[in-house]
Amino acid sequence: AKNVIYEYNAENDVPVAIFMAHIDTVFPESVPLELTEKDGKWFCPAVGDDTANVALLMLMAAYVANEKPKTNGGIVFVMNSCEEGLGNLKGSHALNARYGKRIEQVISFDGYLDGIVGMAVGSLRYKVTVKTAGGHSFVDFGNVNAIERLSAIITELYQYKIPAGSAKTTFNVGTISAGTTVNSIAAQAEML
């Protein structure tokens, strides 16, 4: 993980409180992150998830570094990476590996929703691959098409009813890749 860490009074084996905000975004590197201003407000892809919180975290760290408050334990400010996409919280897992049992609390600033989540968030990422014989669209017409089979799986997934309760459960098919040419029956299709 490519975490950026600032430790304050966190030497030796003192207990630590971790404050973090993630520095990666859901946007691919090809998307320009251009800042614009309109009516006194700033707009930019990823400003709410999670750039504004990273700026807040840096201000907090600067305040602590300058004012040097007395603390009962260590404070760890982290701009963590590998939170979005296939990173699957790798930056957070690296913090757990580094600080382990020393961690007394973790506060993650993430997103811009008006609410506080007071529990850990679980996250699983799956890559589902469908393989079939495929073939030529004319000669092998009738062979099973991997795209059609994957589409059926996705349709069934989105029919799933989320259980009622206080915990939030979500799922998403974010990417699909399949096929090789317009005249071939797809032999492979995958989703993430």
Report each predicted region and the residues it spans.
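A short glycine/serine-rich beta->alpha loop
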Residues: 39-48, 134-137, 179-180
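Acidic-glycine-rich active-site phosphate/pyrophosphate-binding loop
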Residues: 24-37, 103, 118-129
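Acidic-enriched catalytic cores of C-N bond-cleaving enzymes acting on peptides and small amides
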Residues: 140-185
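Acidic/His- and Gly-rich active-site-bordering loop/insert found
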Residues: 1-43, 63-66
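Short glycine-enriched loops at secondary-structure junctions
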Residues: 21-26, 111-114, 121-123, 176-179
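Short, flexible turn/loop "capping" segments at secondary-structure junctions
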Residues: 130, 184-188
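Short alpha-helix boundary/capping segments
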Residues: 45-52, 138-146
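Acidic/histidine-rich catalytic neighborhood of metal-dependent amide-processing enzymes
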Residues: 41-42, 46-125
